[in-house]
Amino acid sequence: MVETKPKPTEVQKKKTLYEVMFKSREFIIDVYLRFDCFIYLILGGFGFYQPSNLITLLNYSKSDLGLFNNTDSSISNNNNNNNNINTEEQYSTYDNNLLDNQNEFQIDNNNNNNNNEFIPLYQNPILISVVTMYTLMVSLVAIFQCLISLLALIQKEKSTKSILINLSLTLNFFLLLFNTYVLSTQSEIFSKFAYMGLIVSYIISLLDFSALFFLTSKHKSVLSVISSIFSFFLMCLKVRPKLPKLPKLNSNNNNGNKKKK
C-alpha cells in the first residue's frame, strides 16, 4: 500500500522567524558587519580626536599630590619671556621633553603661602601622557577592527571571509579578557560614573561577541584554537621529566646472599 503524506497545515506553511534568519544568514552577517564597522570607526575616531579625555574619568581628588614644585609662583602658559619660569632649575630630574610640557599647565597658588607646593595628580603631565598613549592604543585597535569588518564585507570568497571573521572574534575575545581583568582588579582607578559606563560597555562588547559568534556558528576555528591553547598549557603542566630508576641496593644484596646459601 502506498502511504499518503498528510497535507501541510497552515501553520506549517508559514515560515518561522528562525527559518527566515537561517536562510538569509549571510545577509544578516553582512548587515551586522556594517554595523560593527560603523561603531568601531566612531570609537577610533573619537579616541584620536580627544586622546587625553580619559583622564576626566579617573578617580582622583584635587587634594592628590603629584609633581613637586618648590617655588611660590605658578606654571603658566604665557608667551612673555619675563613671566616664564625656569623649569630646568625646578625639575632637574625630569627629561627636557617633559619639562617643555610643564608650561601647558597652570597652578593657582594665590591662596598658598608655603614655599613647598605640589601639582595635583590630574594636572601631572606624566599621567596625562600615559593616559593619552593608552587611549591611542585602544583607538588603533578599534580602527583595526573596523578595517577587518570592512575587508570581510568586500571579500566574496567564503574562506577568506571566514578567516577575517575569526580574526575579529579572536580579537574581541582577548579584549573581553582584558576588560574582565580591569573590572575585577582595577576598578578603583575609575570614578563611579566611569565604572558604570565601563560595565555598560563591557556588556555591549559581550553581546557583540555573542551575536557575531552565533551568526557565524559554522566558523568554529576560534573555539578550536582556544581549546588547543588551553590543552597545550595543561599538557605542559602534566608533563614531568622522567628520571632513570636507580637500582635497589637492598634487594640485590638479599638476592645474592640467598644464591650463596
Curated annotation (Swiss-Prot):
Compartments where found: Membrane
Origin superkingdom: Eukaryota
Residue intervals passing through the bilayer: 38-58, 134-154, 163-183, 195-215, 219-239
Membrane topology type: Multi-pass membrane protein
GO cellular component: membrane
Keywords of the record: Membrane, Transmembrane, Transmembrane helix
Annotated protein name in UniProt: Uncharacterized transmembrane protein DDB_G0293304
